[in-house]
A protein has these predicted regions:
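Helicase motor core with emphasis on the C-terminal RecA-like subdomain
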Residues: 10, 16-60, 64-67, 71-93, ...
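Beta-strand/loop-dominated core regions that host nucleotide or nucleotide-derived cofactor-binding catalytic loops
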Residues: 519, 526-541
């Protein structure tokens, strides 16, 4: 155990004892548990990484790969689609960073398209990839990495299309509207595409997942049309059926790696039944953690509660006000980035957040997590708890129960809270209204061929037949025989059976995350898709 982790362990053990002995808070703690540390397990890659890349990793503290990282990279080398579901902070991103940088070091043609459901995740990954590439001696020509999303200025977009990077970072919304809808401008990228990264795969459930299934099918179809054959690399939170979910979402089987080789320090867990307001109890615990020198994150279930707790803290503990921030969707992107940077730099000691900080943006080393109410799923619970305890430090998670039945059940049955498996993920690729919209997009991008696209068309036969009946899709009939001596046709007739769409830009009719409504925000207005792509999903916003 490192010196830092020993110090943290002493601090956290002492804090738990102090809280239990506290005349006010002690009686409210109904259960405490300690989840012991896990040792690291390493594995070697054969053949090894390029020497310069291995040296860059070593300088960053990664002298050997953990076994799940090595297994993931090896699967990608074998051209296998791979799914990684190891815990938060287990280094999953190296599984997709290393193949791209190794290809760059070897001077190969392969390119990567890294898709993140939130813009902030893409910004975070670009910084990490660029730093690792520079440390390995790779320049922009060899290992360029660019972001192409709704915030990218028009002139910059044109420059990216003209000079394609090794890795293009985007999100599903921009892929749907800005890339697939204008795919002929991206032909060289699609032809050389070796890896498609699907980060935070568990977010693609429900109606968003139904849409994304079709966006991905359209992308893969266009890749095939120009000779591309990319491997899918997916990472996800732990789920009971992650492998089947990935197969349902993408239509392809995955090599599923769930066992982590990353070390994990011990974790303390407290379940709290407040004798009054859960918000007051959570605020008291927050202040105690900050006074103990612990970097702390509080997760609430609603934006209003986030701002309420932040307001109470500023009023009741003015000395702490400059050390704490709130974080939620509805903030402008730069406001959120400022909070993320301050947390990472250590200039903030605490943050009160909705689910917006649940996913893997790196905000540095946090020690304590306070859940104001059960988050609604074990998957979200462990995702949020996993935001603390990085960098070889022990951590503490406290759940302050709300008065509803499920929260109270877990307090009465704490082993259920500790042992309950994560939930199953559900996606419906066969959703017919969704399928109809994307069939129009696919046919507008590249006419559907009954032979080449047989599997896709058969899966959505009902939706296809309806669009043909309505005349929204058209199918080329056999060309009539030409009379002797007739002039050749001015235009080449369409191949028999080809299915095409005359509507221009049907992509604009589809919002992947909503219904196409417009939302008012502080600085103006944004369409539902753009607002959602720039915001943070979740019950609290």
């Amino acid at each position: 155990m490192s010196r830092n982790s020993v110090a943290a362990a002493v601090t956290l053990s002492g804090l738990v004892e102090e809280l239990r002995a506290d005349s006010r808070l002690g009686p409210q703690i109904v259960h405490s548990a300690y989840l012991p540390a896990q040792a690291a397990r390493h594995a070697e890659l054969e053949p090894p990484l390029p020497a310069a890349l291995a040296a860059a990793l070593a300088r960053g503290g990664v002298e050997r790969l953990w076994c799940h990282q090595a297994a993931g990279v090896a699967a990608v080398r074998r051209r296998r689609d791979v799914l990684i579901t190891t815990p938060t902070a287990s280094g999953k991103s190296l599984v997709f960073q290393l193949p791209a940088l190794a290809e760059a070091a070897a001077g190969g043609p392969g390119r990567g398209l890294f898709l993140f459901p939130l813009k902030a995740l893409g910004q975070d990954q670009r910084g990490k990839l660029r730093r690792l590439a520079a440390d390995a001696g790779l320049d922009e020509e060899q290992a360029g990495c660019e972001i192409y999303d709704g915030d990218t200025p028009a002139a910059r977009r044109a420059a990216i299309r003209k000079r394609l990077p090794r890795v293009l970072i985007s999100n599903p919304d921009m892929l749907h509207l800005g890339i697939l809808g204008h795919w002929t401008s991206w032909g060289p990228l699609l032809a050389d595409l070796s890896w498609i990264v699907l980060d935070e795969l568990h977010t693609y459930r429900g109606i968003f997942g139904s849409h994304f299934h079709h966006v991905l099918q359209r992308l893969l179809r266009l890749c095939r049309s120009v000779g591309g054959d990319p491997v899918l690399i997916a990472s996800s939170a732990t789920a009971a059926n992650a492998g089947q979910f990935a197969a349902d979402l993408t239509g392809r089987p995955f090599e599923w790696i769930a066992e982590s080789g990353a070390p994990r320090e011990g974790r303390h867990l407290l379940l709290v039944r407040p004798d009054g307001s859960p918000y007051t109890a959570a605020l008291r615990l927050f202040v105690r953690c900050l006074d103990a020198g612990l970097k702390t994150i509080v997760f609430t279930k609603a934006r209003r509660i986030t701002e309420l707790l932040y307001s109470w803290l500023r009023r009741q503990e003015p000395a702490l006000a400059s050390r704490v921030a709130s974080y939620r969707a509805g903030f402008l992107p730069e406001e959120r980035r400022d909070v993320e940077r301050a947390l990472f730099a250590g200039t903030l000691d605490g943050v009160i957040s909705t689910s917006a900080l649940e996913m893997g943006i790196d905000v540095g080393g946090l020690d304590a997590c306070i859940l104001v109410g059960y988050p609604g799923s074990m998957m979200a619970t462990w995702q949020r708890s996993g935001r603390v305890g990085r960098d070889g430090r022990e951590s503490i998670t406290m759940m302050v129960a709300m008065p509803d039945a499920l929260d109270q059940y877990f307090l009465d049955h704490p082993q259920q809270f500790l042992e309950r498996p994560c939930e199953r993920l559900v996606v419906d690729p066969g959703n017919q209204p969704v399928a109809r919209g994307h069939l129009l997009c696919a046919a507008a991008e590249l006419p559907l061929e009954p032979r080449q696209d047989a599997a896709y068309l058969e899966r959505h036969r009902t939706s296809l037949d309806e669009l043909l009946r309505q005349g929204q899709l058209l199918q080329a009939a056999p060309a009539p025989p030409e009379p002797p001596g007739a002039e050749p046709p001015a235009a080449e007739p369409r191949p028999e059976g080809e299915i095409f769409c005359l509507r221009r830009h049907p992509q604009r009719l589809i919002q992947l995350r909503g219904t196409g409504n417009t939302y008012a925000i502080l600085a103006g207005a944004a369409g539902a898709g753009k607002a959602a792509a720039g915001g943070e999903p979740g019950p609290g916003g």
